[in-house]
């Protein structure tokens, strides 16, 4: 998802 999404924040 988007890097701005809390769910994907760790995947930035």
UniProtKB/Swiss-Prot annotation:
Signal peptide: none annotated. Hemocyanins are copper-containing oxygen carriers occurring freely dissolved in the hemolymph of many mollusks and arthropods. One of its GO terms (molecular function) is oxygen carrier activity. It comes from the Eukaryota. Hemolymph. The keyword Lyase does not apply. This is Hemocyanin subunit 1. It is found in: Secreted, Extracellular space. One of its GO terms (cellular component) is extracellular region. One of its GO terms (biological process) is oxygen transport. Keywords: Copper, Oxygen transport, Secreted, Transport. Belongs to the tyrosinase family. Hemocyanin subfamily.
């Amino acid at each position: 998802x988007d890097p701005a999404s809390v769910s994907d924040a760790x995947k930035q």
